[in-house]
């Protein structure tokens, strides 16, 4: 299968820089798959799972939003956060979800509610993705 250069970058580090056969991620308009020779494209990423398929098999990452840019040279994912599913601390993510739920009950400001809802969504997504992959190992 044909490959393309994939880069995944967060504000803190370069997470990946290698060849891939396909990457599937969630954009704000729905799930999207990218393969070699995809047309140039830009999209906003949503909180969700990113699956990468290569000759070495399949990997999964948690992505907390950001942007996708597809060009002739490469596919770049500029993520707020990107964590290999194997590195997710499920118990910590569950605690983060509980804290966010408790905080939501107390909030009055719309902007605070939106930020806390995103934190809750991120924590619950981490738990879902990590638990899903633990059962497949």
Swiss-Prot record:
Name the family the entry cites: Belongs to the ATPase epsilon chain family.
Q: Which Gene3D superfamilies match?
A: F0F1 ATP synthase delta/epsilon subunit, N-terminal
Predominant subcellular localization, coarse grouping: membrane
The role this protein plays is: Produces ATP from ADP in the presence of a sodium gradient across the membrane.
Q: What is the annotated localization of this protein? A: Cell inner membrane
Q: Topology versus the membrane, per the UniProt entry?
A: Peripheral membrane protein
One Gene Ontology cellular component term attached to this UniProt record is:
proton-transporting ATP synthase complex
Keyword terms, alphabetized:
ATP synthesis, Cell inner membrane, Cell membrane, CF(1), Ion transport, Membrane, Sodium, Sodium transport, Transport
According to UniProt, the name of this protein is: ATP synthase epsilon chain, sodium ion specific
Tell me the subunit arrangement. Answer: F-type ATPases have 2 components, CF(1) - the catalytic core - and CF(0) - the membrane proton channel. CF(1) has five subunits: alpha(3), beta(3), gamma(1), delta(1), epsilon(1). CF(0) has three main subunits: a, b and c.
- What are the recorded Gene Ontology BP terms? sodium ion transport
Gene Ontology molecular function: ATP binding; proton-transporting ATP synthase activity, rotational mechanism
Fill in the misc note.
Answer: The ATPase of P.modestum is of special interest because it uses sodium ions instead of protons as the physiological coupling ion.
Specify whether Signal is a keyword of the entry.
no
